[in-house]
Regions:
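Short, Lys/Arg-enriched N-terminal segments with co-localized hydrophobic residues
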Residues: 3-12
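Short alpha-helical
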Residues: 28-29, 92
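Short glycine-/small-residue motifs
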Residues: 135-138
Length: 150
């Protein structure tokens, strides 16, 4: 598959939504974090799981513990949590989420920041954990066509 320039990004953006299921200690905590703090609409649920609309993608919090090990890799002088998941947002949506999380008192693993400023692939990023320890990275690019820039 050819993946170069703006055409590749348009192709990527036509992908279907992803689905991710992950463990949480408590569904009420997950509802507060993903629903109230992050603003994700709730979908179907049961006593053991709850769906959230994660920027057009389906994530499902399942009872069954926490995220387990808290491994990390050094990146740009920060300890980046591994594994982690997230979404590439528009810059205005990223800033709105950063403001929302900051106002709600979120504890960031890596504070909202700009990486590669003035370079190809310039991006805004932030890392944080949900109450069960699942790590999330939310990012946005100054130029979406630079998603895979080297």
């Amino acid at each position: 598959m050819h993946r170069a320039g703006r055409g590749a990004y348009a192709e990527i953006m036509s992908l279907r939504p992803f689905h991710l299921a992950f463990p949480v200690r408590d569904l009420a905590e997950a509802r507060r974090f993903y629903g109230e703090m992050m603003g994700c609409a709730e979908g179907r649920s049961s006593n053991e799981w709850v769906d959230f609309d994660f920027y057009g993608h389906q994530i499902v919090a399942h009872t069954g513990g926490d995220a387990g090990d808290r491994a990390s890799n050094p990146v740009d002088g920060h300890d980046v949590p591994v594994p982690h998941f997230g979404v590439v947002l528009t810059m205005p949506d990223w800033q709105a989420l950063a403001d929302r999380l900051t106002a709600a008192g979120a504890e960031f693993v890596i504070e909202p920041t700009i990486r590669f400023e003035g370079q190809p692939g310039e991006q805004a990023t932030m890392f944080f954990r949900d109450p069960s320890g699942n790590a999330l990275e939310m990012k946005a690019f100054a130029d979406d066509a630079m998603l895979f820039a080297k």
